[in-house]
């Protein structure tokens, strides 16, 4: 399936797992809530999907890349405790709380959200000492002797063996306890996301002309050459910033993100043409309604890729203006709602309290900032990347 369908399925699963019956108990008992296992090549957006699902479902998110952990941080540190069993005292080994479990409780405390998603990435690439712990985690939803809190949905992700030499295959016993989703790169689906995320229009128009260059992983005698969706998105962010600073991105820089020499060379040449068309056609003048007659004459004779580039430039310019307008409207609406609530509160304030209005207004601001920060900690605030002026 593609990443969009996977996102929808995860979102539906979270809602189903967190649904409660008339007695306030989870409709699907925790023991029947199978963890979701996403399997797919690197860089296709698995982590971003989890952030979107958590935000849209209004739950917290704790994400870990498990290859960054040791058995001690995942399970906890051992310590000796004295116990009385039968008729004698004995020393037994217990463990401190898992760092991962502790981070869930810390997230709950920081955000005020008791339900959430625990996302474990690269779960099938762990070290030999941690592999049994991950199997226990998927099968029993525990780290050591500590269970994942109720109300937390487990989602794990891994890479197929052809993309990672460290991959460990799961046995049938484990696979029979998870919901496996195999994800494949899908350019049309990614373009929907890219437009919403304001991916640089040069990248979008280039991939429109060369869809085969969206995602490739090739191995030869010179090593592995690859380009991923993550690489295109990160390059887009850099191009935006470079344009703002008046800097030029060359092929060497592009190779740092697009680690496929032929594709990097091809895109670098396209990007040079893209900027040339922007200057030659005077995109800002066109958007201002001051297009020169020569522009129309040239456009009639232009090849298809040149016309497509110009359309992308114009759409990027319009996108910048539309987004700025939407952001201004959102700020105005938020200010209006805040002032309306403040006015209601002022109406209930006794008149004989000196400086009461100023104190109330100050407290309203503090409460608003605290609420906003709590939502930010819970990743419930949608912060769409601001598009730069690419025209």
Question: Can you say where each PLM-predicted feature lies in the sequence?
Answer:
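Alpha-helical transmembrane segments and their juxtamembrane interfaces
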Residues: 131-132, 238, 377
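Conserved small/polar residues in nucleotide/adenosyl-binding loops
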Residues: 382-391
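AAA+ P-loop NTPase catalytic core and its hallmark functional loops
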Residues: 1-205
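Long intrinsically disordered, low-complexity regions that are acidic and Ser/Thr-rich
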Residues: 346-377
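General alpha-helical segment detector with a strong preference for membrane-spanning helices
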Residues: 163, 232-234, 390
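Active-site catalytic microenvironments for nucleophilic, acid-base chemistry
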Residues: 56, 140, 238-241, 386
């Amino acid at each position: 399936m593609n990443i969009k369908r996977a996102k929808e399925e995860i979102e539906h699963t979270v809602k189903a797992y967190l649904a409660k019956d008339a007695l306030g108990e989870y409709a699907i008992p925790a023991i029947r809530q199978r963890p979701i296992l996403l399997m797919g090549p690197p860089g296709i957006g698995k982590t971003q999907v989890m952030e979107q699902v958590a935000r849209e479902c209004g739950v917290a998110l704790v994400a870990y890349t498990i290859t960054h952990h040791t058995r001690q941080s995942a399970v906890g540190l051992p310590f000796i405790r004295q116990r009385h069993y039968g008729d004698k005292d004995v020393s037994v080994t217990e463990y401190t709380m898992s760092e991962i479990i502790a981070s869930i409780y810390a997230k709950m405390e920081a955000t005020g959200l008791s339900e959430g998603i625990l996302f474990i990435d690269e779960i099938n690439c762990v070290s030999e000492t941690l592999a049994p712990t991950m199997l226990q985690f998927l099968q029993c939803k525990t780290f050591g002797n500590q269970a994942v809190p109720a109300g937390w949905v487990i989602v794990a992700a891994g890479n197929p063996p052809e993309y990672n030499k460290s991959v460990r295959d799961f046995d049938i016993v484990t696979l029979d306890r998870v919901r496996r989703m195999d994800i494949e790169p899908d350019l049309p689906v990614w373009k929907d996301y890219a437009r919403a995320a304001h991916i640089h229009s040069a990248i979008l128009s280039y991939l429109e002309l060369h869809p085969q260059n969206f995602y490739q992983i090739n191995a030869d005698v010179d090593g592995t050459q690859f380009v991923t969706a993550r690489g295109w998105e990160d390059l887009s962010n850099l191009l935006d910033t470079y344009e703002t600073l008046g800097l030029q991105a060359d092929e060497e820089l592009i190779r740092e993100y697009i680690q496929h020499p032929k594709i990097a060379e091809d895109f670098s040449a396209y990007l040079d043409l893209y900027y040339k068309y922007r200057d030659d056609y005077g995109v800002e003048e066109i958007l201002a309604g001051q297009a020169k007659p020569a522009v129309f004459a040239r456009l009639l004779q232009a090849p298809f890729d040149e016309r497509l580039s110009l359309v992308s430039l114009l759409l990027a310019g319009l996108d910048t203006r539309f987004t700025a307008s939407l952001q201004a409207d959102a700020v105005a609406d938020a200010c209006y709602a805040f002032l309306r609530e403040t006015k209601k509160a002022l109406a209930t304030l006794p008149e004989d309290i000196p400086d009461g209005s100023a104190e109330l207004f100050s407290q309203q601001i503090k409460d608003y900032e605290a609420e906003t920060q709590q939502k930010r900690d819970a990743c419930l605030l949608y912060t769409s990347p601001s598009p730069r002026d690419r025209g």
